[in-house]
């Protein structure tokens, strides 16, 4: 059985998790945090989450894992058959991750962990993120899914990344930068009504609450 390593608060972990759930693939979850420990680096050379264990062998990087899952478990496809449409799904994922989530991540310290982002950082992020939101709005079809009529890996990515972009910008800037893309809110509501997304989100919330309680207990 496949084993997914990571923790339920991680959006990249949850991207893979919800894909596995949507495809009906049996898997185990192995709790672990990011680490530079030598033993852990044998599983994930950059020390990140998630990783996937396959019969004692390991893969890292969420998109690589998704590609492997699709190649080995094609029964419930999360990529279209047409080559161009498959590329469009990957295009959306790239915009979501490189031009939105990783840009907004520079705000997470202030938004979620009690840190402070410099005025220069906030200014740069706001400018770069506006471009990412514009690109996503242009490319996403919302008919009803991001890439068209069928659920795809683009939705697995959007469902875990967009809420973080939304919340972090609302906290730091006092406005949700995803408001510039009106279809996003009903789209996310639609995704979150799916059993796989609901299960992933329920377990994410439980893990978030547990981490907050543990932190409060420490002091």
Predicted regions and their residues:
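Short coil/turn segments at secondary-structure boundaries
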Residues: 105-106, 201-204
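Short, solvent-exposed alpha-helical surface patches in well-structured domains
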Residues: 88-91, 186, 199
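GST-like domain detector, emphasizing the conserved glutathione-binding G-site
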Residues: 1-131, 143-146, 217-218
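A late-sequence structural motif
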Residues: 194-195, 200
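A generic structural-conservation signal
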Residues: 29, 149, 200-201
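GST-like fold's C-terminal all-alpha helical module
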Residues: 96-193
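Acidic/histidine-enriched, glycine/proline-rich intrinsically disordered or flexible terminal extensions
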Residues: 204-219
């Amino acid at each position: 059985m496949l084993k997914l390593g990571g923790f339920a608060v991680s959006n990249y972990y949850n991207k893979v998790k919800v894909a596995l759930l949507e495809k009906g693939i049996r898997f185990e979850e192995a709790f672990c945090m990011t680490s530079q420990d030598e033993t852990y680096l044998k599983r994930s050379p950059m020390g990140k989450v998630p990783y996937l264990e396959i019969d004692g062998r390991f893969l890292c990087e969420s998109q690589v894992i998704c590609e492997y899952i699709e190649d080995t478990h094609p029964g419930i496809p999360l990529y279209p058959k047409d080559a161009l449409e498959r590329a469009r799904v990957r295009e959306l994922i790239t915009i979501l991750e490189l031009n939105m989530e990783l840009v907004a991540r520079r705000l997470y310290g202030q938004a979620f962990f009690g840190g402070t982002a410099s005025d220069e950082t906030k200014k740069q992020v706001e400018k770069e993120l506006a471009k990412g939101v514009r690109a996503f709005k242009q490319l996403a079809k919302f008919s009803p899914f991001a890439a068209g009529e069928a659920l795809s890996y683009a939705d697995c990515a959007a469902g875990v990344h967009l809420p973080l972009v939304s919340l972090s910008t609302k906290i730091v800037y006092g406005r949700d930068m995803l408001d510039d893309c009106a279809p996003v809110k009903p789209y996310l509501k639609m995704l979150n009504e799916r059993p796989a997304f609901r299960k992933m989100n329920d377990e994410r919330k439980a893990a978030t609450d547990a981490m907050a309680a543990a932190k409060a207990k420490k002091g």
